[in-house]
Amino acid sequence: MSVGRLWSGLLLLLLFFCSRSSSCGLSTHVEIGHRALQFLQLQDGRINYKELLLEHQDAYQAGTVFPDAFYPSICKQGKFHEVSESTHWTPFLNASIHYIRENYPLPWEKDTEKLVAFLFGVTSHMVADVSWHSLGIEQGFLRTMGAIDFYDSYSEAHSAGDFGGDVLSQFEFNFNYLSRRWYVPIQDLLRIYDNLYGRKVITKNVIVDCTYLQFLEMHGEMLAVSKLYSTYSTKSPFLVEQFQDYFLGGLDDMAFWSTNIYRLTSFMLENGTSDCNLPENPLFISCDGRKNHTLSSSKVQKNDFHRNLTMFISKDIRKNLNYTERGVFYSTGSWAPESVTFMYQTLERNLRMMFTGNSQTALKHVSSPSASYTLSVPYARLGWVMASADLNQDGHGDLVVGAPGYSHPGRFQIGRVYIIYGNDLGLPPIDLDLDKEAHGVLEGFQPSGRFGSALAVLDFNKDGLPDLAVGAPSVGSGQLTYNGSVYVYYGSQQGRLSSSPNITISCKDTYCNLGWALLAADADGDGQHDLVISSPFAPGGGKQRGIVAAFYSHPRRNDKESLTLDEADWKVNGEEDFSWFGYSLHGVTVANRSLLLIGSPTWKNISRMARSSHQKNQEKKSLGRVYGYFPPNRQREITISGDKAMGKLGTSLSSGYVRVNGTLTQVLLVGAPTHDDVSKMAFLTMTLHHGGATRMYELAPEKTQPALFSTFSGDRRFSRFGSVLHLTDLDDDGLDEIIMAAPLRITDVTSGLLGEEDGRVYIYNGMHTTLGDVTGKCKSWMTPCPEEKAQYVLISPEASSRFGSSLVSVRSKERNQVVVAAGRSSWGARLSGALHVYSFSSD
């Protein structure tokens, strides 16, 4: 049988299996299980469960997807749908625990170890589905995705999200860890189901056939499903942007909850279930005598969106099965994806040359940073946020960097903040491992608190020394409250920060996510910076309306003081549910008055008629809006609204001084990174979905509303041009350079069909800014042309690293530097993040 015939059949199977049902998510669940295992540490008991799971990856990975095996109609016409449903809930886990304890006492033989590994994978799937599908909880991933991108339709979000998550996983992640064989404990499963139901409900052949289909599908996804990236990216910007990071049901949150259920499962395997509370919903299991009363623990039907599907599976797809006494192994044999990978890579290279050419790098391209800083801990999110300030008061700019995903074994996503001091020549000009060579480190102490998600430097207690505020928005995740906290560390005469927080600010509201963003800005009119805190996910009087609050700096701030959000000196809320008010913050002085700008990128323009008649399709989704306040006044003075659905105006904000047609002008930049634009290639036109755009407004004291001066646009679909904005003077001419990032940009114009992300950062000289469509006036045959108009273009040194996910400028006596974060770089460790330093001078 030819490889081509077999893979044609397998891809056909994949197409029908996933695109017409909602039972997919294989790649997503395998990835969650892989991440959960990375930092697993179960110290109590007689078994080293991490070693057991690492040894039996074949069973563990099969378990992570098993609960969905009997949902799709291709599996025996869907007759065993209810068996899959029951496998998602606590009674199945309880039956499995009792079965193992009654039949296989310690020490376990290898087949029993495989059964245990398989069960751990199943439990990961259980808790992941609860937060992903919002089962018994509010504001899980798909519920929020539906509210923002699908007119509040959960069913549409479900249909796009389950398989879309797999597409995104295969496009963004390397699955080189996937086992080439899987093990399913058939005989043990039959007996567990007998005990659970009290009768026979399924046969050996059904389990074998349906789990083997999952095995085939998983390897089929490895081959080609990433090529559907453009389709699913168009459907949901939320899916692309929040898939890993969303606080309740993002990949990292689901991995955190997997580690929790592993701890409980190991306890029950060794001690029984008598000391445990076992509600129907596995997310609420507890074995410490405490119950979570915050949210409902009732069972909710997981999957009811499957369509009928019947198809013939080609007999050419030969079953590579090896039965044992208690189970069965599935193997790829000679038809593994690796056997045809070379063919696809060669085709991609040849076609990519057609679309991108092989010309020499343009002179304005900067492809090599002067230094790169990394970590050796995976998933750390190094560079999620950065700040620059002279912390040690030596006259040189220093760099402060957040890594909210930083973990230790047994301490998942506690987060870290790193400090790197500058000198006359700027930041260290050599590559660094920040865990070993950073000048200062602060570490979070709450499980999955994501300490380091936001940073602000200010003199909070007005003692003349810089203090550091750090956001940890997921504090309370273990209780499913996600209240969040902000910690303030006081500076000292020695130039060092306190080793523990001097001030803690907390929020009592569930899903408050306090500390998602921080800003140092004057909020009381005394000319000194105050602490501005925001959370776009906070209730704000509804659901995810968002809040922004300010705490004034003053010398009466006591050491070890605890504050709550209710004690804020100034506070405003968002207007609409899921409008994400406070997603971005920016402070600027206009005519000696402090203007606070607040972005609300998912704001909708809901007409009164649509609101009264509940006609959701009359809304324009995610237009975005920017609000301007002159604190301490709480009255809104400025409003800038988006005009394109899904454009998300207000995602990013920055301001500075440039020359516009020769006139010195104070300007405001507002990013709309998912704005659609039109590209022209000779006589052809193409819509650049989510290519991104940035508006430049004049900030004139005599005008009540900023006047639109110029626009900039990206040149690739889905590139998120303008998602990060910054203005700073790099050449010491008194004018700010305009810096714009496109972290999801793809080199070729096929938007993922032939290439990977290779984000770019564009630097425009502040001396030569023009009115109108800046990137639309092109000499080349293609528009827009953001590269043609730029003075410098910083090129990502690593594919698929989200180069440009954040950036900051650092000043020293000899040079000015730009630090660009690649938030998903794998240079130091898998998806750990990296910082790239670029130096500029006035010469």
UniProtKB/Swiss-Prot annotation:
GO cellular component annotations, sorted alphabetically?
A: cytoplasm; extracellular matrix; extracellular region; extracellular space; high-density lipoprotein particle; intracellular membrane-bounded organelle
**Signal sequence coordinates:** 1-23
Q: Which UniProt keywords apply?
A: Glycoprotein, HDL, Hydrolase, Lipid metabolism, Repeat, Secreted, Signal
Q: What is its main location?
A: secreted
Q: What is its EC number?
A: 3.1.4.50
Q: Which GO terms describe its biological process?
A: cell migration involved in sprouting angiogenesis; cellular response to cholesterol; cellular response to insulin stimulus; cellular response to pH; cellular response to triglyceride; cellular response to xenobiotic stimulus; chondrocyte differentiation; complement receptor mediated signaling pathway
Q: Where in the cell is it found?
A: Secreted
Q: Which domain of life is it from?
A: Eukaryota
Known glycosylation sites: N94, N271, N292, N308, N322, N483, N502, N592, N605, N661
Disulfide bonds listed in the record: none
Gene3D superfamilies per record: Integrin alpha, N-terminal (2.130.10.130)
GO molecular function terms noted in the UniProt entry: glycosylphosphatidylinositol phospholipase D activity; phospholipase D activity; sodium channel regulator activity
Catalysed reaction, written as an equation: a 6-(alpha-D-glucosaminyl)-1-(1,2-diacyl-sn-glycero-3-phospho)-1D-myo-inositol + H2O = 6-(alpha-D-glucosaminyl)-1D-myo-inositol + a 1,2-diacyl-sn-glycero-3-phosphate + H(+)
Q: Where are the FG-GAP repeats?
A: 368-429, 435-498, 500-560, 564-625, 635-695, 707-773, 791-843
Post-translational modification comment from the UniProt entry: Glycosylated.
Q: SMART domains, from UniProt?
A: Int_alpha
Pfam families per the UniProt record, alphabetical: FG-GAP, Zn_dep_PLPC
Subunit composition and interactions: Monomer.
State the family it belongs to.
Belongs to the GPLD1 family.
Tell me the function of this protein: This protein hydrolyzes the inositol phosphate linkage in proteins anchored by phosphatidylinositol glycans (GPI-anchor) thus releasing these proteins from the membrane.
What name has this protein been given in UniProt? Phosphatidylinositol-glycan-specific phospholipase D
Q: List the top taxonomic levels of the source.
A: Eukaryota, Metazoa, Chordata, Craniata, Vertebrata
